[in-house]
Amino acid sequence: MFVGHYGVSFAAKKAEPSVPLWVLFIAVQFLDVLWAPLVLLGIEKVRIVPGITATNPLDLYYMPFSHSLVTAIGWSVAAWLAYRLIVPTAPRRAATAVGVAVFSHWVLDFLVHQPDLPLYDNTAKVGLGLWNLPAIALGLEAVLLFGGMWLYFRLGAARRTGMLVFGVVMLAIQVFVFFGPPPASDKAAAATAIVGYAIFALVIRALERLQMVTS
């Protein structure tokens, strides 16, 4: 799961408008934001194995710190607490929205991953494997992304064109990720991921600021 995670960001913004979209963009990818530097440091492990699934060449064989169910719950609670401490004036439900956004990553990954998501440590691995069904996997990404965006638009956002164009670009990137060439190495995959998440967060911050100026 990649761009489908961002659908949760838009839905969470609809549920709790006080949380900036860029915060929610980071929250829904937080487990991967952790995963990337852990791979770069050699703490978590991934191999590039073209064909291991129909749409994703990553053999994610060791990621107990970022993607086990137990640590996902822990990171979600930590995100809730961090938001409460960093933004003490925000309503309690704002921190809850951030925590739920973080945990949603594991839930959506469970749908698409092959059984490589550990329940705890590096054992009892699960995953429904929708990455092996390209049309369904891509359709799910699109439905989640644009479904969440539709909920966000119900807030009465004044300018929708920029958001929609961004959504189309995101989906195009998803198609490239699914069907383009595999990453050159495990480190290249991790570095590309962290740069991509940062760029997406910066773009959505700019688009939301534009919404605020023109609304």
Segment roles from a protein language model:
Residues 1-215:
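N-terminal membrane-targeting hydrophobic helices
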